[in-house]
Each structure stands twice: as structure tokens, then as C-alpha cells.
């Protein structure tokens, strides 16, 4: 029964994809991104469509290395090109990134990576409805302005003017690892008028329109986190659990681990699921 629901969802997901599509899928080896990759592999099977993975390595805890190696193994098994983005802050001077800084860093890395693609990619992110609801409460409880554009399924973001450290691994063609460009902090690599300097490493980027918008799609927003949990249990996906999700030091984890369970006890077992419907 559950498998029928999964494949019916995969069929619905096909409506988001055009006949020819260059997909950049964010991948952390967690249950959300793993299920998204599972769906995309079943959908993108013909030669006209391309799929690439991107993994952001935070270096903030020892368990991150497990996700790092799991991403490499999955990419090598399915012969999918993998891009690894490394965190650039100096951990000796700054022990923790704020949640907003970490989120902005991830989105910027997705957009910068789009500059490396020959064709304009569609960025697929494994955000569920639970993530969007947490984002809403995160803004609401901090008394900040709530941008409802963040709650929509599709987003359009401007590509930033700087380019960061990337390691690109193409398993289909070769196993070589190429370091792309240099650190964004080195201002010598970028002119004041935002035109990239002329050299062989950056010639391809001079052809890019840095004012273009990149489409960010979140196809799992109709699903609750518990739904994804049941799917990955049934499919036996080899996910890596992020222990930082249990750390209530972070604001979002307090919303997820404390606020939502209390709401289910006091009001309704499906309170958070019902609230998600407001943003769809």
C-alpha cells in the first residue's frame, strides 16, 4: 500500500519536470534529500535530462564526515556528478554559524554552482512542509518580517557576484577532482564593476549573465516529515542521521522538538499537518 502511494507521488512529481531539464539536486544523505533523489532517479531516466548532486560540508561536527562519505558513495554507485561545497569561515575565530548565516551560505552556494553549468539548472531542494512551517514560526517568534515568498513551492533568486571554493567530481567521464577558482574573500579575483578577470579558469563565466534568476523548486512541500520517515523506512534508504537536529541550542530545533509536540498534545495530533495546508 505504501509503495503504491510512493509511486503515485513520483507520477505527480513528473508534472514539475519538462522534457529536457538540467537538475541540480541538493543532497545531504538525510531522509528528505535521499527520498528526493530516489524520486528523481526514477523520473529522470532518459538521455535528454541531466542530474547533478551538491553537498554542503559544514565541518561543524564530527558526524558530518559520515554524510560526506555517504554522498560520495551514492554518487559513485549511480554515476551521478557530485559537487562538494566547503565551509569557508574560520572555525578558530568563530565556533558557530547562526541559523540565518548557515541558510544564506547554503543558498548562495547553490546559486554560485549554477554558474558552473553549461545550461541553466533547476535547483531541487528536499524541503518538506514541516520545514516551511518551522520557517514560519521561526520568523514569527523572532518578531521579524515574514516573507511569504519563502513559503511558496518555487523561488527565484539572484546569482551572487562572487564565486567560492568548489570541488567537482564527474564520475561519468573521469575520477579527477578539480578545485574551481579561489576563495571569495580574495578581492583580487573580482573587479570593482563585478566583471570576472580574464584568464583561462574564468573564461566560461564571462559568458554568464550574472543578473539572471535561478529557479529553486521544493517538490516535497506537500509531504510531512513523518510521511518521509515512513517512506524511507519502507524503502530501506541508507540515510545518515544528523545529530545536530536533536540539539535544542538551535532555535528551529526547539520549534521542532518542543513546540510542535506540545501543540499535538494540547490541540490535535495532526495540528502541524493541518497548519502546513495554509501555505500550499
From Swiss-Prot:
Binding-site residues, ATP: 28-33
Lineage start: Eukaryota, Viridiplantae, Chlorophyta, core chlorophytes, Trebouxiophyceae
Localization of this protein: Plastid
SUPFAM superfamilies (UniProt xref): Adenine nucleotide alpha hydrolases-like (SSF52402)
Cell membrane as UniProt keyword: no
InterPro entries registered for this protein in UniProt: Rossmann-like_a/b/a_fold, TilS/TtcA_N, tRNA_Ile_lys_synt, tRNA_Ile_lys_synt_N
Pfam families registered for this protein in UniProt: ATP_bind_3
Protein name: tRNA(Ile)-lysidine synthase, plastid
Annotated gene: tilS
This protein's UniProt keywords: ATP-binding, Ligase, Nucleotide-binding, Plastid, tRNA processing
EC supergroup of this enzyme: ligase
Amino acid at each position: 500500500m505504501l509503495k503504491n502511494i510512493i509511486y503515485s507521488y513520483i507520477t505527480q512529481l513528473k508534472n514539475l519536470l519538462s522534457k529536457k531539464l538540467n537538475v541540480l539536486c541538493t543532497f545531504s544523505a538525510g531522509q528528505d534529500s535521499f527520498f528526493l533523489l530516489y524520486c528523481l532517479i526514477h523520473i529522470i531516466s532518459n538521455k535528454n535530462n541531466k542530474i547533478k548532486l551538491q553537498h554542503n560540508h559544514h565541518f561543524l561536527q564530527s558526524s558530518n564526515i559520515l554524510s560526506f562519505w555517504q554522498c560520495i558513495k551514492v554518487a559513485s554507485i549511480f554515476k551521478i556528478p557530485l559537487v562538494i561545497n566547503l565551509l569557508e569561515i574560520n572555525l578558530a575565530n568563530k565556533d558557530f554559524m547562526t541559523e540565518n548565516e548557515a541558510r544564506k551560505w547554503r543558498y548562495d552556494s547553490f546559486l554560485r554552482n549554477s554558474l558552473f553549468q553549461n545550461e541553466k539548472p533547476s535547483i531541487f531542494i528536499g524541503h518538506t512542509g514541516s520545514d516551511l512551517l518551522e520557517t514560519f514560526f521561526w520568523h514569527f517568534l523572532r518578531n521579524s518580517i515574514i516573507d511569504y515568498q519563502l513559503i511558496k513551492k518555487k523561488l527565484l533568486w539572484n546569482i551572487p557576484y562572487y564565486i567560492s571554493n568548489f570541488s567537482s567530481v564527474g564520475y561519468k567521464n573521469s575520477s579527477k577532482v578539480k578545485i574551481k577558482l579561489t576563495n571569495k574573500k580574495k578581492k583580487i579575483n573580482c573587479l570593482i564593476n563585478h566583471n570576472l578577470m580574464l584568464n583561462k579558469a574564468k573564461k566560461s563565466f564571462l559568458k554568464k549573465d550574472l543578473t539572471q534568476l535561478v529557479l529553486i523548486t521544493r517538490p516535497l512541500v506537500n509531504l510531512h516529515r513523518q510521511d518521509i520517515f515512513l517512506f524511507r523506512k519502507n524503502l530501506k534508504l541508507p540515510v545518515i542521521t544528523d545529530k545536530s537536529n536533536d540539539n535544542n541550542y538551535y532555535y528551529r530545533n526547539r520549534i521542532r522538538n518542543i513546540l510542535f509536540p506540545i501543540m499535538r498534545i494540547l490541540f490535535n495530533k495532526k495540528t502541524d499537518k493541518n497548519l502546513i495546508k495554509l501555505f500550499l
